[in-house]
Amino acid sequence: MNSAIARICALAALVTFGTFGAQAAPLQCLAPAKPGGGMAVTCKLIQKGLQIPAVAEAQEGSLKISYLPGGIGAVAWNSIVSQRRAEADTLVAFSGGSLMNLAQGKYGDADVSNVRWVAAIGVDYGMIAVRHDSPYKTLRDLLAALKKNPAQVTIGAAGTVGSQDWLKISMLARQSQIDPKTLRFVALEGGGEAFTALRAGHVQVVSGDASEATLHSLDGEIRILAVLSEQRLPGALAQVPTAREQGLAVSWPIIRGVYVGPEVSDAAYQHWVKRFDAMMATPEFTQLRAATGLSSFAMSGDQLTAYIKKTVEDYRKQSDQLGLIR
């Protein structure tokens, strides 16, 4: 009898906790990688942006940032589409690399329509970095060493063969008559882990993103050899030459933004879209975005969804031509 009553009380407690817990669910941004990379940059920028007075909502606590690495984003994606489909208070960071993984089938049978795309808040660019004490002073120095003996240079990056970081260095290699298949490529879980490996000497080069480099180069321990943009970037990386300036016509833009689960209500989804539109229109957000190393790019809702569908299809065609489709 006592055990039966105890079970009933326990069940009642769970129901009560669940009801009130749902009402007080903390607003969070989920970064599908380890701390210190571009996904974290996205979440931290949104965390600051939502506190702008014109955008902040009464009684809303600070955005919590959580991390769910694994499978170069696949673990977080699968968590949202299978178990957390209706969590309106959970924003998930994505990048152009996420779209590349979708195109190549690295998220299994995932499709663009599996989630609801909220907003793209800025554009990042690829970059190539080494340690401050590296013998490679320029991008040309590095490529000359790779051409002479690719086995002696270890390149770290987020993702596996076929990922956007792999493609960046591969495009530079091809333009220097180097077979990308000869490169020593170490797959790591996010840009933060790649820079940690670089600092520790486990890799000699990082193929990553400018926002990550902005974060990790502040102490002078990292030398950035090139940014993969059409023109030099403003802000902290203003003195870094582009690959084009060094004779290599390679540019790699990367959008950054967030999505929510597929069963988030229309009302909640539209609320997020309108709120991000308002946030991205403020001069305060423009300053915050520039400080993170991101450039101007703002798109949301249906327009963003259409853009992503086209981008994924373009990536799929390119990847198929390179034999990278699973």
Regions found by a protein language model. Name each.
Residues 34-36, 96, 131-136, 158-163, ...:
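Short coil/turn segments
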Residues 52-58, 79-90, 102-193, 243, ...:
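Hinge/capping helix and adjacent helix->loop/strand transition within the periplasmic-binding protein
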Residues 9-19:
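Bacterial N-terminal signal peptides
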Residues 23-114, 177-205, 296-299, 319-326:
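N-terminal (or domain-start) structured segment
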Residues 266-326:
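An extracytoplasmic/periplasmic, membrane-proximal ligand-sensing/linker region
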Residues 212-280, 310-313:
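C-terminal lobe and pocket-closing loops
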Residues 69, 152, 157-239:
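Ligand-binding pocket segment of bilobal, Venus flytrap-like solute-binding proteins
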Residues 1-10:
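Bacterial N-terminal signal peptides that target proteins for export
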